[in-house]
From Swiss-Prot:
Taxonomic source organism: Clavispora lusitaniae (strain ATCC 42720)
The organism's place on the tree of life at top rank: Eukaryota
Ranges in the topological domain labelled Extracellular: 34-42, 87-100
Transmembrane segments: 13-33, 43-63, 66-86, 101-121
Domain named SH3: residues: 239-299
Cytoplasmic-side segments: 1-12, 64-65, 122-299
Subcellular location: Cell membrane
Matching InterPro entries: SH3-like_dom_sf, SH3_domain, Sho1_SH3
Record gene name: SHO1
A cellular component annotation (GO) from this entry: plasma membrane
Name of protein: High osmolarity signaling protein SHO1
Length: 299
């Protein structure tokens, strides 16, 4: 997948915790540097080096969007770091030296960060704590991946009828929402009915004819677990470049028609794999979005 800064910047939890860790480490290393060498625990130096390596590792894993593949490894490494920082705090906090106290304050902050990461990376994706943290990033990160004006292959035309309204009973306001290529954002309500589609639903010309809607193939779209057929819309063909295996079962939220449900070990076709939400297609042709921490890319 390659390193992409968007993977890191699209996750508020990653930005806030890594930034907090860097600041806490700077406080600790500044205190250590200003302390007298004969009055400073030497093993604390190794603890600080170990801690910055952990922060860099988490940052790189977020950049590569592979944090979920190594979260159990991180829990073990962070547990060791938690012991280092708490032990250093105990050795420094009772000192009267200002440098030692500054380093102790930094170690306390690093201990708090290590504990938070242990709880998050060690928790199940469906746990209340993880879902609460992920809720701040999931929806916003997927909105940034929606089609924009520069994705010409995703644009399509909704035909108008002779009376001036769109074919298949689409209103003027609805048509302007669906075909507006100047906006880089579309809300989930604007995407209703457009999420799930099959390759047979688009003619080779890239537009939909409205002269004989009864003869057009039905479009299959998501109803959160129940596939229904509707001929109101035809949508563009999307290429799914990757395959992924479901690590856990997932039930689509009834409040978001864009989500799809799937079961553990199911093979999905996915695309737009930046951020927390990926575009996915099931074997039955159902298309929508899935949380990236529930699936694993296959080679």
């Amino acid at each position: 997948m390659g390193f992409r800064m968007a993977n890191f910047l699209g996750d508020p939890f990653a930005i806030s915790t890594v930034s907090f860790g860097v600041i806490a480490w700077i406080v600790a290393i500044a205190g250590a540097g200003s302390s007298a060498s004969d009055n400073f625990p030497r093993f604390t130096w190794w603890g600080l080096v170990y801690e910055i390596l952990l922060i860099i590792m988490v940052f790189l894993l977020y950049l590569n969007n592979t944090i979920e593949l190594y979260k159990f490894t991180l829990v073990g490494l962070l547990s060791v770091g938690f012991l280092y920082t708490t032990n250093s705090t105990n050795n420094l906090i009772y000192s009267s030296n200002s440098g030692n106290l500054c380093c102790a304050a930094g170690c306390i902050l690093l201990s708090m960060l290590n504990f938070l990461w242990i709880v998050y990376f060690g928790g199940h994706p469906e746990s209340p704590s993880n879902q609460f943290i992920d809720s701040f990033a999931m929806k916003s990160s997927y909105a940034q991946q929606l089609p924009s004006e520069k994705n010409d292959d995703h644009e399509f035309a909704v035909p108008r009828s002779a009376s001036g309204s769109q074919g298949f009973g689409v209103s003027d306001s609805r048509h302007s929402q669906l075909t507006n290529s100047k906006s880089g954002y579309m809300s989930s309500s604007q995407l209703n009915g457009l999420e799930n589609f099959s390759h047979t639903n688009v003619q080779n010309t890239g537009t939909v004819g409205a002269s004989n809607p009864a003869s057009m193939p039905n479009t299959v779209y998501n109803t959160n677990g129940t596939n229904t057929a509707d001929s109101n819309f035809a949508v563009p063909v999307s290429t799914f470049r990757y395959k992924a295996r479901a690590l856990y079962s997932y039930d689509a939220s009834p409040d978001d028609i864009n989500e799809i449900s799937f079961v553990k070990d199911e093979i999905l076709e996915v695309d737009d794999i930046d951020g927390k939400w990926w575009q996915a297609r099931r074997a039955n042709g159902q298309v929508g979005i899935c949380p990236s921490n529930y699936v694993k890319l296959l080679d």
